[in-house]
Amino acid sequence: MANHSSAKKVVRQTIKRTLINKKRSSAIKTFIKKVMYEISRGNKEDANLALSVAQSKIMQGVKKNIIKLNTASRKISRLSRQIKNLHKSE
């Protein structure tokens, strides 16, 4: 446990930041799940709309240092590829 007041403040700040980051990370995962749901339904238009929203949220997460840029790019690329393959299958 921290003894100095400045160390106690750092602990409080860390707890606060951790909660905020978990909330943002959870939101990103939720938007990705929405895209996956639309892909599983085979709904191209809704999947594209969900992807555009998810892409925005993912890149906001990069800006806030929730996830790394390469991870975000990989997730967006894989979702886009799945939607593209959905177009080909029909």
From Swiss-Prot:
Key word Isomerase present: no
GO terms, biological process: translation
GO molecular function, one term: small ribosomal subunit rRNA binding
Top-level taxon of the source organism: Bacteria
Keyword entries, A-Z: Ribonucleoprotein, Ribosomal protein, RNA-binding, rRNA-binding
UniProt cross-references to Gene3D superfamilies, sorted A to Z: Ribosomal protein S20
GO cellular component, one term: small ribosomal subunit
Cross-referenced NCBIfam families: S20
UniProt function note: Binds directly to 16S ribosomal RNA.
Annotated HAMAP family: Ribosomal_bS20
Family: Belongs to the bacterial ribosomal protein bS20 family.
Name by which UniProt lists this protein: Small ribosomal subunit protein bS20
Organism: Rickettsia typhi (strain ATCC VR-144 / Wilmington)
Gene expressing this chain: rpsT
